[in-house]
Amino acid sequence: MQKRLPRSLVEKIMQKIPLTVRGAEMLKQELQHLKSVERPAIIEAIAEARTHGDLSENAEYEAAKEKQGFIEGRISELENKLSVAHIIDPTEIHAEGKIVFGCTVVLEDLENETQVRYQIVGDDEADIKDNKISISSPISRALIGKEEGDVAEVQAPGGVREYEVIEVLYI
């Protein structure tokens, strides 16, 4: 019999954005860079553009203001994400061999008998070149809750793909 989480806890977690420790650190570094480097540089660029006269026909000024809007929007977005982040350390997961957010899985594609290794991460961390797949991807959704030896069926553009779970790691 599977243990079920209380509904209130599930709802609370669902309001949070799951991030690995590394993913949260990357967002914090980007936020720090935007605030300490990019924001001051664009403020300086706007001040410089103002010295060039009529603002209504000043392309430099318009470009700098547009960039400022982008930077301020990204700062706001990062601050919001970090404020609602649920940071998960894969090394502290006790999922008894089940595939959960943050874990690394070794899979065998049953069609061509090749093995792949993925870490299941948040949307902002996903990078297929680095073998990090989003928790919201079709393959992750098919894998969550599976254990070693289980077979997951994934709806792919070319049809259904089957993957056998070879290993589940919490690293």
Where on the chain are the PLM-derived regions?
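Elongated periplasmic alpha-helical coiled-coil
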Residues: R50-H52, V84-I87
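Helix-rich terminal scaffold detector
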Residues: M1-E72, S76
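Short, intrinsically disordered, mixed-charge
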Residues: H33-S36, F70, N80, R141-E148
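Generic alpha-helical hydrophobic packing signal
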Residues: K28-E30, K65-Q68, K81, Q115, ...
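Non-DNA-binding regulatory cores of transcription-related proteins
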Residues: I88-L169
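Amphipathic alpha-helical coiled-coil segments
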Residues: E72-H86
